[in-house]
């Protein structure tokens, strides 16, 4: 699969982009080169703290997961409390996520979930080719 290609660094010493015959294309939900919006802010803060070596779609996805759940918990309101059982919390979150809840974060905007838990969000097409090394 193409997981992680979004973090490909064509400037790494020893990386020979000419070994890519023409180009490699992949779909991703995160642009690790973004400088604008929520993703740009995430990238700036992340690289200030951890450096750019570990920046990838996986960290961005984890970040969005935490904040999507946080937002859904706020949306659930008093259906969730410190005394709620794990089962009750799960039921409340399933209700929120399955009833039109949307989240905008670093991996996309207006992210929605279906009633059976599948996520719906736009993917972006990226192309890595020899000209990227210049």
Model-based region annotation:
Residues 1-134:
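Extracytosolic ligand-binding ectodomains
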């Amino acid at each position: 699969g193409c997981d992680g290609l979004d973090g490909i660094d064509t400037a790494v010493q020893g990386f020979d982009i000419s070994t890519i015959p023409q180009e490699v294309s992949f779909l991703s939900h995160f642009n690790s080169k973004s400088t604008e919006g929520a993703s740009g802010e995430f990238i700036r803060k992340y690289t200030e703290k951890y450096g750019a070596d570990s920046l990838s779609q996986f960290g961005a996805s984890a970040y969005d997961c935490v904040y999507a759940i946080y937002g859904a918990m706020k949306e659930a309101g008093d259906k969730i409390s410190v005394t709620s059982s794990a089962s009750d919390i799960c039921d409340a979150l399933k209700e929120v996520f399955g009833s039109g809840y949307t989240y905008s974060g670093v991996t996309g905007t207006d992210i929605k979930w279906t009633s059976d838990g599948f996520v719906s969000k736009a993917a972006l097409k990226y192309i890595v080719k020899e000209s990227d090394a210049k």
